[in-house]
C-alpha cells in the first residue's frame, strides 16, 4: 500500500487538535473541534482551510487558449489576465472528467485547479488530448509547488487585510491578484476571491516553502476575529448547503454537467468545438432524463450518498449527498432522479438502510448568503 500523502501544513494540525483521515490517499483533518462548530464558525466569523491537496496544472504557450477551448466546456475567450472561471472537462459521451477553476495568469499562461483525487487522471487526460508541439504548448502538473489555503466567512476580508498592504476588498468575485506581498512572508501569493462554502472569502496560492508561515500569519491576525482552522467534514457540509457540486457525488463519468444543473458552465454555442459538445448540446436543447434536485426528509432519517429514491416502490434515482444541515437543522439531500418527479413539493421515498422513509422535493441551494 502506498504511503499517505501529506500537505506542508500537516505539521501544524496536531497543535490544533486535528483528527485526520485518509481522504483519497491524503492524510487530512476531518475536524479540529467539531464539524457542527466549525460549520457555524465559518458561517458567522471565518474559517481557515488547508486545501493544498488540490491539484494545479499549468498550461502555457501560444496555443494554450485554443487548446483549452477544446478541452473545457466554458468559454475561456471571455477571460483576461486577473480573471478566473468555473469550468468542466467532459468525455465525448457528456460524462464528466472533472470540474475545475481556470486562472488566466497572462495571455499564454493558465493555471488549472482540479480536484485532488483526479489530479493525475486529469493531467494525463489533458496531455493525451494535446496534439500541439512543445513550442506551441507546455502542460505540467505543478501541484507540489503550491500550498493552497482558503479563508472563508464574513470576517475573511477584514482578517486578510491585516496580512497585506494590497487592497483585498477591491478583488471582485472570481477575480484575482497575483504576486501579492504578505507581511513577513518571503514568497508572493496569488489571492483569488473564490471559495467552496457559500460564504465570501479568498483562496490563496503560495510557494510550498512559505505555506506554514502563511497559515500561522492568518491564524495570528484572525484570532481577534474568531478565525479557526476547519476540517474536511465542515468543508463538505458548507459546500453541500450552498449546492456546490462534489466530484464523485454530484458529478462523475456517468453524470453530465447538464444533469447536475451546471449548464451555466457549458457554452454549447461558443465558436470552437469542444469534447462532448454534441451530446451536451442535445441535452441543453432537448432536456435530460434525470435532474439533480433537493430533498428534505419528512420522516426521521438522514439521506446518505447512494441511498435509493423511490416513487410507488419503484426506484427513480439516488442520493448524491446528504446530511443534517447545521444551518437549517433539517435532514436534507441532493438527489439525481427521473425528470418526471422533480417538481417542487413532490413526495418521494428514500430507502434508509432497510426502512422506506417519506421525503419531498425542495428548492436548492439550502443556504444562500444574505438570505
Curated annotation (Swiss-Prot):
Q: Which domain of life is it from?
A: Bacteria
Tell me if Coiled coil is a UniProt keyword of this record.
no
What are the alphabetically sorted keywords of the record?
Aminotransferase, Transferase
Q: Does the keyword Transferase apply?
A: yes
Give a Gene Ontology cellular component term annotated to this protein. Answer: cytosol
Q: Which InterPro entries match?
A: GCS_T (IPR006223), GCS_T_bac (IPR022903), GCST_C (IPR013977), GCV_T_N (IPR006222), GcvT/YgfZ/DmdA (IPR028896), GcvT/YgfZ_C (IPR029043), TrmE/GcvT_dom1 (IPR027266)
Documented EC number(s)? 2.1.2.10
Any single GO molecular-function term of the entry would be:
aminomethyltransferase activity
GO terms in the biological process aspect are: glycine decarboxylation via glycine cleavage system
Pfam families listed in its UniProt record: GCV_T, GCV_T_C
The UniProt catalytic activity note for this protein reads: N(6)-[(R)-S(8)-aminomethyldihydrolipoyl]-L-lysyl-[protein] + (6S)-5,6,7,8-tetrahydrofolate = N(6)-[(R)-dihydrolipoyl]-L-lysyl-[protein] + (6R)-5,10-methylene-5,6,7,8-tetrahydrofolate + NH4(+)
Q: What's this chain's function? A: The glycine cleavage system catalyzes the degradation of glycine.
Q: Which family does it belong to?
A: Belongs to the GcvT family.
Cite the HAMAP family for this sequence. Answer: GcvT
Describe its assembly. The glycine cleavage system is composed of four proteins: P, T, L and H.
Q: Could you identify this protein by its name? A: Aminomethyltransferase
Species name for this entry? Answer: Oceanobacillus iheyensis (strain DSM 14371 / CIP 107618 / JCM 11309 / KCTC 3954 / HTE831)
Lineage of the source organism?
Bacteria, Bacillati, Bacillota, Bacilli, Bacillales
Amino acid at each position: 500500500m502506498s504511503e499517505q500523502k501529506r500537505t506542508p501544513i500537516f505539521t501544524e494540525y496536531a497543535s490544533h487538535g486535528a483528527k485526520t483521515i485518509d481522504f483519497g490517499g491524503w492524510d487530512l483533518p476531518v475536524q479540529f473541534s467539531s464539524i457542527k462548530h466549525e460549520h457555524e464558525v465559518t458561517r458567522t466569523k471565518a474559517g481557515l482551510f488547508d486545501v493544498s491537496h488540490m491539484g494545479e496544472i499549468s498550461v502555457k504557450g501560444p496555443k494554450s487558449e485554443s487548446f483549452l477551448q477544446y478541452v473545457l466546456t466554458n468559454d475561456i475567450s471571455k477571460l483576461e489576465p486577473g480573471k478566473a472561471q468555473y469550468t468542466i472537462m467532459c468525455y465525448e459521451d457528456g460524462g464528466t472528467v472533472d470540474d475545475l477553476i481556470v486562472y488566466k495568469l497572462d495571455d499564454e499562461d493558465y493555471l488549472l485547479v482540479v480536484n485532488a483525487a483526479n489530479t493525475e487522471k486529469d493531467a494525463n487526460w489533458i496531455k493525451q488530448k494535446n496534439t500541439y508541439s512543445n513550442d506551441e504548448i507546455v502542460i505540467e502538473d505543478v501541484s507540489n509547488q503550491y500550498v493552497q489555503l482558503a479563508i472563508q466567512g464574513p470576517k475573511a476580508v477584514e482578517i486578510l487585510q491585516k496580512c497585506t498592504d494590497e487592497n483585498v476588498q477591491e478583488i471582485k468575485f472570481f477575480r484575482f491578484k497575483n504576486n501579492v506581498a504578505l507581511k513577513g512572508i518571503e514568497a508572493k501569493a496569488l489571492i483569488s476571491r473564490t471559495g467552496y462554502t457559500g460564504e465570501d472569502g479568498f483562496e490563496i496560492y503560495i510557494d510550498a516553502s512559505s505555506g506554514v508561515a502563511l497559515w500561522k500569519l492568518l491564524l495570528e491576525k484572525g484570532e481577534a476575529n474568531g478565525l479557526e482552522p476547519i476540517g474536511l467534514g465542515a468543508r463538505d457540509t458548507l459546500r453541500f448547503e450552498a449546492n456546490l457540486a462534489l466530484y464523485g457525488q454530484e458529478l462523475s463519468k456517468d453524470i453530465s454537467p447538464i444533469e447536475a444543473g451546471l449548464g451555466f458552465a457549458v457554452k454549447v454555442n461558443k465558436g470552437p468545438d469542444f469534447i462532448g459538445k454534441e451530446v451536451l448540446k442535445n441535452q441543453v436543447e432537448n432536456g435530460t432524463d434525470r435532474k439533480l434536485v433537493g430533498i428534505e426528509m419528512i420522516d426521521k432519517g438522514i439521506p446518505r450518498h447512494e441511498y435509493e429514491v423511490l416513487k410507488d416502490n419503484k426506484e427513480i434515482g439516488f442520493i448524491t449527498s446528504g446530511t443534517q444541515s447545521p444551518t437549517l437543522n433539517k435532514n436534507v439531500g441532493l438527489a439525481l432522479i427521473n425528470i418526471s418527479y422533480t417538481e417542487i413539493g413532490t413526495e418521494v421515498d428514500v430507502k434508509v438502510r432497510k426502512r422506506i422513509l417519506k421525503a419531498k422535493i425542495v428548492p436548492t441551494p439550502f443556504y444562500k448568503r444574505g438570505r
